[in-house]
């Protein structure tokens, strides 16, 4: 264990904590360890099925057949998702759940890695160039023979928090956007997205991280 040097007069805190007990408990593979991990992380111990699953429409473009689906996680807004398959595919396919990145970009979720029925937002296209080599990788996987489920995760896209629901202090800080969060093309639309992404980052750091630590 590397020594701690940035805690000032509390630099010996780490040493005392390690003296009282091992930093990492011994965890042998098996059901007991899996159960302990669930308890520590606050996972639900029972089944967690998607609720009220709905099909919202279908499309086909560029060799991919898509279906828009949505479901309830039991709290918050409905989760919007796309199920992508090779066009014309029949029968069962190997499946992949494709997850988008964090990227400090919460305005969109699934759109960052997948093309849906409409052309991608230019802001998303620019982001893909930086993060994914310009590709919608979920569609690439579908064209190669996979059934790919792409959904908005908690805090992104359809599951994002509206700015008006954020505390006043977060909105005040967000009004003074850090220059590092400037959009690339300078359009009004890009400015709106950059404003939201900065506010959402502040909200995650100052508020949501704390709730997640408490709720699991």
Where are these regions (language model features)?
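Short coil/loop residues immediately preceding or within conserved phosphate-binding loops
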Residues: 66-68, 78
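Conserved, well-structured beta-alpha core segment at the onset of a catalytic domain
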Residues: 57-61, 88-91, 140
């Amino acid at each position: 264990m590397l020594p701690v040097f940035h805690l000032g007069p509390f630099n010996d805190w780490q040493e005392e904590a390690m003296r009282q007990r091992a930093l990492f408990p011994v965890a042998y593979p098996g059901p007991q360890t899996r159960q302990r991990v669930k308890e520590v992380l606050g996972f639900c111990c029972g089944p967690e099925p998607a609720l009220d699953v709905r099909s919202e429409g279908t499309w086909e473009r560029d060799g991919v057949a898509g279906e828009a689906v949505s479901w309830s996680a039991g709290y918050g807004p409905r989760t919007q998702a796309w199920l992508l398959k090779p066009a014309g595919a029949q029968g069962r396919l190997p499946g992949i759940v494709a997850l988008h990145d964090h990227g400090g970009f919460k305005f969109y979720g699934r759109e960052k890695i997948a093309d849906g029925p409409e052309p991608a937002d230019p802001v998303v296209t620019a982001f893909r160039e930086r993060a994914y080599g310009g590709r919608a990788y979920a569609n690439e996987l579908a064209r190669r023979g996979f059934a790919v489920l792409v959904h908005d995760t908690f805090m992104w896209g359809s599951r994002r928090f509206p700015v008006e629901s954020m505390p006043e202090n977060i909105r005040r800080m967000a009004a003074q956007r850090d220059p590092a969060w400037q959009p690339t093309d300078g359009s009004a639309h890009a400015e709106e997205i950059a404003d939201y992404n900065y506010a959402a980052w502040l909200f995650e750091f100052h508020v949501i991280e704390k709730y997640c630590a408490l709720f699991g």
